[in-house]
Every structure is written in structure tokens, then in C-alpha cells.
């Protein structure tokens, strides 16, 4: 079992430069404490996430830590050009000596997608094409691709990752019917939610994995479970701290939905 941190970098009420510095100091603490990895969210136009460009913040994390693995959870591929993602991934992996964990996803907020002119209902094909191009660019020295959204002919890729063929891939998983793709492609998954549906997902993952891979259980990709946790001297103190932090985070979480008259 490994322990990591997932951070939205949501607005905290302090000056933004101090907000970033506070988080970087926390990353240094996670590094010294022996945490496995530090993951950050990507959000746009909302106080839920101040690391709108994950690569910029993670470049600082790479320089402030020595052993801690880190990465986006996730890069929103439907909002970014795949060649830029390829190049930033390679740079981060090189700058950290091969410590990048690569989270990828389509994006979950229709309002944030709309800021970029992307229709959330039609974003799946865009995401799939972008993912295919990113994986090609991380594995090969030249990109040739013909799709609906992207067309590339003999595009050279001069950068490369330390980790071969790619850094570890992470994918957020909320439904068991999405498991086969992740298990077949040996992608690490992370889940939220109650224990029962999460168990359904992880059981299904192990089942599909065993059908397609024969390397043994020690090669099974990681399956993460997200939980809000506060450690304090007493339950009462922990609850008090947790409520203060959770109330602020949840207000930020609802921000765009409330602004569009769709409160959660």
C-alpha cells in the first residue's frame, strides 16, 4: 500500500504568490515524510483550482523535491494540443529524473470546457484522438496521424522521457463499465465514492487484468482510492479542522455550478 496526496490547489484566501509557496513547502514536507506521490488537479475559471497550467506548478515541484513522485490528475486532454502535452510531459520527466506520474482525462466540468469552445457532449472523440497522439509522441520519434480533429504528417519529436516507454499513466474511474480499457492498457486507476461501487470497479479491474496479462500480481497497476483525511489529537479536533477545510473546498467545488443556476 502506498500513500499519496491529491491537491486541487483551491483558493485559500491568501495572496496567490503565497498560496503557491505554501503548497510548494507542503510538497517538500511530503517528500521528506516519504509519501509516494503528489497529484494536482487542473481547473479553469473557478476558485476550485489555481494550478490552471499544471506543468508550470509541477516544474517547481520537480526542483523542490528529491524522491517524491508527482503529476497532474489530470491533464484535460480535450482542452490542450497533444503536441504541447507531449513536450511538457517529456520536460517534466527529465527535470525530475524520471518521477512524473501522468494523469490523463477528458474533463468533468461542461462549464470549463465551454470556456475553451469545447462542447462537453461532443468531447469524447476529441479526448480519444488527443490521447492516441500523446501516446504515439511519447513512444516514437515522429508523429503520423489522421483523425477527425488532428492530422499530423512527419511531425518530429525531439524530446523524450526518462521513463520508458512512458511515465506511469493514471485515469480517474467512476464506473465499472469503463474498466476494460484501463485494465487492457495497464493504466493505473483512481476512484472516489463509497466502498461498495469502488470494490466493484477494483474487482472488475483484477478480472480483466488477469484475462489479458500474465506477468503476475506483483505487476498489477496501482488502484487508488481518494479520501478526505484529517489527523489530529482527538476526534473532536479533527472534525473541527475538517469541517473548516471541507466547507471552503466544497464552496469552491460548487462555484461554477451555482453561477450557472445548477447547484449540486
What name fits each language-model region?
Residues 3, 30, 34, 42, ...:
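Conserved, mostly hydrophobic/aromatic
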Residues 31-32, 58-67, 89-100, 183-184, ...:
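Acidic (Asp/Glu)-rich catalytic clusters
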Residues 3-7, 38-40, 69-73, 100-104, ...:
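Hydrophobic faces of well-ordered beta-strands that scaffold small-molecule active sites
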Residues 175-195:
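A conserved active-site cap/scaffold subdomain adjacent to cofactor or substrate pockets
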Amino acid at each position: 500500500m502506498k500513500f499519496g496526496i491529491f491537491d486541487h490547489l483551491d483558493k485559500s484566501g491568501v495572496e496567490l504568490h503565497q498560496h503557491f509557496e505554501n503548497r510548494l513547502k507542503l510538497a517538500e514536507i511530503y517528500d521528506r515524510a516519504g509519501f509516494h506521490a503528489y497529484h494536482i488537479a487542473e481547473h479553469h475559471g473557478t476558485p476550485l483550482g489555481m494550478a490552471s497550467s499544471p506543468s508550470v506548478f509541477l516544474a517547481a515541484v520537480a526542483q523542490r523535491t528529491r524522491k517524491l513522485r508527482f503529476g497532474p490528475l489530470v491533464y484535460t486532454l480535450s482542452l490542450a494540443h497533444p503536441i504541447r502535452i507531449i513536450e511538457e510531459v517529456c520536460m517534466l520527466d527529465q527535470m525530475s529524473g524520471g518521477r512524473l506520474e501522468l494523469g490523463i482525462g477528458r474533463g468533468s466540468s461542461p462549464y470549463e470546457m465551454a470556456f475553451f469552445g469545447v462542447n462537453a457532449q461532443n468531447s469524447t472523440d476529441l479526448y480519444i484522438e488527443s490521447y492516441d497522439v500523446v501516446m504515439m509522441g511519447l513512444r516514437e520519434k515522429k508523429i503520423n496521424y489522421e483523425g477527425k480533429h488532428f492530422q499530423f504528417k512527419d511531425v518530429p519529436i525531439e524530446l523524450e522521457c526518462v521513463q520508458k516507454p512512458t511515465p506511469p499513466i493514471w485515469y480517474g474511474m467512476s464506473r465499472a463499465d469503463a474498466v476494460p480499457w484501463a485494465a487492457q492498457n495497464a493504466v493505473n486507476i483512481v476512484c472516489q465514492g463509497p466502498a461498495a461501487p469502488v470494490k466493484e470497479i477494483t474487482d472488475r479491474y483484477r478480472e480483466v487484468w488477469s484475462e489479458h496479462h500474465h506477468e503476475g500480481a506483483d505487476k498489477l497497476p496501482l488502484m487508488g482510492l481518494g479520501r478526505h483525511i484529517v489527523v489530529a489529537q482527538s476526534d473532536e479536533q479533527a472534525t473541527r479542522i475538517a469541517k473548516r477545510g471541507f466547507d471552503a473546498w466544497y464552496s469552491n467545488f460548487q462555484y461554477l455550478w451555482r453561477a450557472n443556476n445548477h447547484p449540486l
